[in-house]
Structure formats: C-alpha cells, structure tokens
C-alpha cells in the first residue's frame, strides 16, 4: 500500500541477497553460508548494497526500507551518509508467532510462489498449485534457523528502537 500510494520502491536487503545467491555471485555465495547458519550478513556488505540501490533513479522521490537497518552500525552509517528517514515503524510480533509463520512457509523455487502449511496451504500437500512440482522449505525458514535469527534480532536490532527515539536534529525521523 505505502509503495503504491507514494510511487516509491520497496527495498528489501533480503531480496537483494537472495538475488545475489541465486545468481551465484561471490557476495551471494558468502551470504548464503552465513544465512544458512542463522547469522546476519556483515554490515559493510549490506550498507554498500543499500547505498548503491538508493542511488538509482526510482528512489529519487523516496523508498521504503524493509528489514533495514538491522544493526546500530547500519543505522549510524545511514545517518553518516546523510540518508534521512521520514518515519521508522516497528512491528512487534511475539517470537512464537514469527517461528510459526516462517517455519511453515513453503516455496515453489521456479516461480517464487509462496504457501504456508497452515495459513495458505497448497491444494495438494507439498505441491505447487500451478505446476504440481515440489515445494521446498528454504534453509533460512527452518525452525532452528529462525530461532537463531530471533536471538540475533534481540541482541542487535532491538536497540534501534531506542536509537531512533533519541535521534535529534535534521536526521531524526519526521
């Protein structure tokens, strides 16, 4: 809704990383190893990707970050780079709901169609509705990996709520 209303792109570091992984780029291969282990990709890599992305023409009227920044270093780097934000939104969801939602997700790799074993199941269990091909659970959607990522979130990302609430002056969200 927001991207359509303001005619701005949604920028997801996760999507950018998945594209790099699918393309088999050196960054993608490095990122895949880290993500599959439940870790977060290094800040310098993410910040570089984001700076390149927001410099593109379709971002001249603004953009919507999805899942970024994730660390204090990323937030500080964006402030230092002069990237000012109009608003910051935290969606507070209990860990148990996140684990349930993510670990239940199934994907048809060729098309990107996404299902959920409980909330949006395919017509035939484990099969894509259109092609009948197998659905997979991405490694980063496995329960153990999701729990590791949540632990990292609580350690590294929760501090951003305090960071943005205390940010003052021209860089503060309006």
UniProtKB/Swiss-Prot annotation:
GO cellular component, as recorded: cytoplasm
Main location, first listed in the record: cytoplasm
Catalytic activity reported: AMP + ATP = 2 ADP
Enzyme class label: transferase
Protein name in the entry: Adenylate kinase
Lineage top rank: taxon: Bacteria
PROSITE patterns per the UniProt record, alphabetical: ADENYLATE_KINASE (PS00113)
Region described as LID: 104-141
Protein's job: Catalyzes the reversible transfer of the terminal phosphate group between ATP and AMP. Plays an important role in cellular energy homeostasis and in adenine nucleotide metabolism.
Domain free text: Consists of three domains, a large central CORE domain and two small peripheral domains, NMPbind and LID, which undergo movements during catalysis. The LID domain closes over the site of phosphoryl transfer upon ATP binding. Assembling and dissambling the active center during each catalytic cycle provides an effective means to prevent ATP hydrolysis.
Region NMP, residue ranges: 12-41
Subunit structure: Monomer.
Enzyme Commission number(s) of this protein: 2.7.4.3
Entry GO MF terms: adenylate kinase activity; ATP binding
PANTHER family: NUCLEOTIDE KINASE (PTHR23359)
Binding-site positions, ATP: 105, 114-115
Keywords carried by this UniProt record: ATP-binding, Cytoplasm, Kinase, Nucleotide biosynthesis, Nucleotide-binding, Transferase
Pathway: Purine metabolism; AMP biosynthesis via salvage pathway; AMP from ADP: step 1/1
Location of this chain's protein in the cell: Cytoplasm
Gene Ontology annotations of biological process type: AMP salvage
InterPro entries named in the record: Adenyl_kin_sub (IPR006259), Adenylat/UMP-CMP_kin (IPR000850), Adenylat_kinase_CS (IPR033690), Adenylate_kinase_lid-dom (IPR007862), P-loop_NTPase (IPR027417)
Binding site for AMP: 13, 18, 39-41, 67-70, 74, 138, 149
The UniProt record lists the keyword Hydrolase: no
Family: Belongs to the adenylate kinase family.
């Amino acid at each position: 809704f927001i991207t359509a209303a303001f005619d701005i792109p949604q920028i997801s570091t996760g999507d950018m990383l998945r594209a790099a992984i699918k393309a088999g780029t050196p960054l993608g291969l490095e990122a895949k190893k880290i993500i599959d282990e439940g870790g977060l990709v290094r800040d310098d890599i993410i910040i570089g990707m984001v700076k390149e992305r927001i410099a593109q023409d379709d971002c001249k009227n603004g953009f919507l970050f999805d899942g970024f920044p994730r660390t204090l270093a990323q937030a500080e780097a964006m402030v230092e780079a002069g990237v000012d934000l109009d608003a910051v939104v935290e969606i507070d969801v209990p860990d148990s709901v996140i684990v349930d939602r993510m670990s239940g997700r199934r994907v048809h790799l060729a098309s990107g169609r996404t299902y959920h074993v409980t909330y949006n199941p395919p017509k035939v269990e484990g099969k894509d509705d259109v092609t009948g091909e197998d659905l997979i659970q991405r490694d980063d959607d496995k329960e153990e990996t999701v729990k590791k990522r949540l632990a990292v979130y609580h350690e590294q990302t929760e501090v951003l709520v305090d960071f943005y609430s205390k940010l003052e002056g021209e860089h503060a969200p309006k």
